[in-house]
């Protein structure tokens, strides 16, 4: 990994992070759940197409994570994520692994000086540990089988869920 920074005299420690993004919105996901014996679960379903996007990077070694929420999913949003991430970890050299999404490979993508990227092979989400976070959030953090009255309510729940991940480092390792 140090080869990515070859030729640079930089004494900052090196950290490996994996990044991914996911869409959360007002279209709820109906899934299995446990209920008392002899009863039947009742879940409201809504079809409102309003979405937010969560960008998250995770260090599998330490369980550290960094997230932002964006109303769009494009290169501009990815640049904002990278800038905020680089500022938060400015005392480190970062290797950031991600998939081949268009906004990851765009010529308009601006990499901060302390971040180098590695692209994962195509069609291999199993290589990105961040992929599993989205299932965990949807199943354990009140997204499945819940309806949200507004997009702001989705944002509040998503922000709460992402903040809780900071205290759940063992889940992220």
PLM regions and their residue ranges:
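Extended, low-complexity cationic-aromatic segments
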Residues: 1-79, 83
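A generic "structured core" feature
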Residues: 5, 18-19, 85-88, 128, ...
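C-terminal anion-handling pockets and recognition modules
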Residues: 12-16, 132-173
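Short beta-strand segments
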Residues: 17-19, 95-98, 118-121
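Short, solvent-exposed loop/turn segments at secondary-structure junctions
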Residues: 21-25, 60-63, 101-104, 123-125, ...
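RNase H-like polynucleotidyl transferase catalytic core
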Residues: 40-48, 113-132
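Acidic/histidine-rich, metal-coordinating catalytic segments
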Residues: 92-104, 128
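Short, aromatic/basic amphipathic alpha-helical patches
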Residues: 106-114
């Amino acid at each position: 990994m140090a080869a990515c920074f070859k030729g640079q005299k930089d004494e900052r420690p090196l950290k490996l992070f994996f990044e991914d993004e996911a869409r959360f919105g007002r279209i709820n996901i109906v899934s299995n759940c446990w209920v008392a014996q002899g009863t039947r679960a009742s879940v409201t379903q809504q079809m409102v197409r309003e979405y937010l996007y969560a960008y998250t990077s995770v260090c599998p070694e330490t369980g550290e994570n960094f997230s932002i929420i964006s109303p769009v999913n494009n290169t501009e949003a990815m640049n904002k994520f990278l800038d905020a991430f680089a500022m938060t970890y400015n005392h480190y050299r970062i290797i950031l692994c991600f998939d081949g999404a268009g906004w990851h490979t765009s010529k308009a993508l601006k990499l901060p000086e302390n971040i180098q990227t590695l692209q994962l092979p195509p069609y291999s989400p199993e290589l990105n540990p961040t992929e599993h976070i989205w299932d965990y959030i949807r199943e354990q953090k009140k997204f499945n089988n819940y309806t949200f009255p507004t997009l702001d309510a989705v944002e509040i729940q998503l922000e709460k869920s992402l903040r809780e991940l900071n205290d759940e480092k063992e889940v992220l390792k």
